[in-house]
Amino acid sequence: MEKMHITNQEHDAFVKSHPNGDLLQLTKWAETKKLTGWYARRIAVGRDGEVQGVAQLLFKKVPKLPYTLCYISRGFVVDYSNKEALNALLDSAKEIAKAEKAYAIKIDPDVEVDKGTDALQNLKALGFKHKGFKEGLSKDYIQPRMTMITPIDKNDDELLNSFERRNRSKVRLALKRGTTVERSDREGLKTFAELMKITGERDGFLTRDISYFENIYDALHEDGDAELFLVKLDPKENIAKVNQELNELHAEIAKWQQKMKTSEKQAKKAQNMINDAQNKIAKNEDLKRDLEALEKEHPEGIYLSGALLMFAGSKSYYLYGASSNEFRDFLPNHHMQYTMMKYAREHGATTYDFGGTDNDPDKDSEHYGLWAFKKVWGTYLSEKIGEFDYVLNQPLYQLIEQVKPRLTKAKIKISRKLKRK
């Protein structure tokens, strides 16, 4: 096994084709981290010219100290049963990490627990310290240890039927409601950033500046690994649909009124059907007024939600999502999610990752809402083997490990205060 020098394109091709590859190991992802002070180095090992393992090493300075942290997010990308390749990757990583004055090498492989016996044993044998099997969204991890993933390698009907029943009904309703899902361009990031600001204010979290999303889009879109989707509501088109539905409801009432005259047996049923239709008419009249007001203010329509969809080979990722406070009954997010899944499948993906979650949290947990939303999309829980640290500077590592919990608690307090505002 030997060190290899490969191009960025060769690195990315290996990551995209490997079962343990991940978006965060793509070279263009490292470009997105520069804004937050990270810089990258890359390593590869192989035999007889064939690559057998790669890793993208991210480095960040420790504040006020001449040291760095080496973080291999969702790496190494290697077969963890191949001890020789794994050992060679660690040797290469140590060489670079020491040159960059790293106090530790942190990894969190994209390897699931039920397939991770070799990885756990072999990493520990090499001297890595396992950080344990904590909850998926534990503050002790950089990346979530658990994510929710929908298999999308199926036709439209099979995909829809894989969703939970109530969610399936909502998706079908969303498809009828009259919103349009657009695959947007860089210019659409302005709209997306505005929607993200609204979402942050509603849900109580700090949002990123538009430059952050532009950075991701610019780095990854050219290779087809980042797409922006927006959901639009056209008032004129939907007013026509509401008028049609109102006409149908009035015709329905007339039909049941006629039956009441000709059949006493059906009188009770007819009255119930009439009452139901009248309730629907009232709701549609309210909706029509809202749409007419929208048409006056925004005749071209408004955007209700948006999301960034990412790719790494056969894996797709729902990375960031945002939505308006208006016209939520149109279920724009349901329309968007189903459309993005189909788009991802058509572009070679077999899985759709909804991102981090805890495993079946209590209803009073701050993470319950996330889990409840993600579990209804035909998802399974992808539980990773977690984080591992390879310590290079023991005194500094111990000091930072002691200080970290206090910093984490301070961040949590600040976050909770923001949510209460």
Curated annotation (Swiss-Prot):
Question: Where is this protein localized, as stated in its record?
Answer: Cytoplasm
Q: Which GO terms describe its biological process?
A: cell wall organization; peptidoglycan biosynthetic process; regulation of cell shape; response to antibiotic
Recorded catalytic reaction(s): these are:
beta-D-GlcNAc-(1->4)-Mur2Ac(oyl-L-Ala-D-isoglutaminyl-L-Lys-D-Ala-D-Ala)-di-trans,octa-cis-undecaprenyl diphosphate + glycyl-tRNA(Gly) = beta-D-GlcNAc-(1->4)-Mur2Ac(oyl-L-Ala-D-isoglutaminyl-L-Lys-(N(6)-Gly)-D-Ala-D-Ala)-di-trans,octa-cis-undecaprenyl diphosphate + tRNA(Gly) + H(+)
Origin superkingdom: Bacteria
Principal localisation: cytoplasm
Extract one GO cellular component term from the record. Answer: cytoplasm
One MF annotation (Gene Ontology) recorded for this entry:
aminoacyltransferase activity
* Family annotation (Gene3D superfamilies): 1.20.58.90, 3.40.630.30
Keyword annotations: Acyltransferase, Antibiotic resistance, Cell shape, Cell wall biogenesis/degradation, Cytoplasm, Peptidoglycan synthesis, Transferase
InterPro entries linked to this entry: Acyl_CoA_acyltransferase (IPR016181), FEMABX (IPR003447), PG_Glycine_Bridge_Synth (IPR050644)
Q: Its Enzyme Commission number?
A: 2.3.2.16
Disulphide connectivity of cysteines: none
Assembly behavior: Monomer.
Function in brief: Catalyzes the incorporation of the first glycine of the pentaglycine interpeptide bridge, which is characteristic of the S.aureus peptidoglycan. This glycine is added to the epsilon-amino group of the L-lysine of the membrane-bound lipid II intermediate (GlcNAc-(beta-1,4)-N-acetylmuramic acid(-L-Ala-D-iGln-L-Lys-D-Ala-D-Ala)-pyrophosphoryl-undecaprenol), using glycyl-tRNA(Gly) as donor, in a ribosome-independent mechanism. Involved in methicillin resistance.
The UniProt similarity line reads:
Belongs to the FemABX family.
Anything else known: Since cross-linking between the peptide strands is critical for maintaining stability of the cell wall, FemX is a potential target for the development of new antibacterial agents.
Can you say what this protein is called?
Lipid II:glycine glycyltransferase
Which gene codes for it? Answer: femX
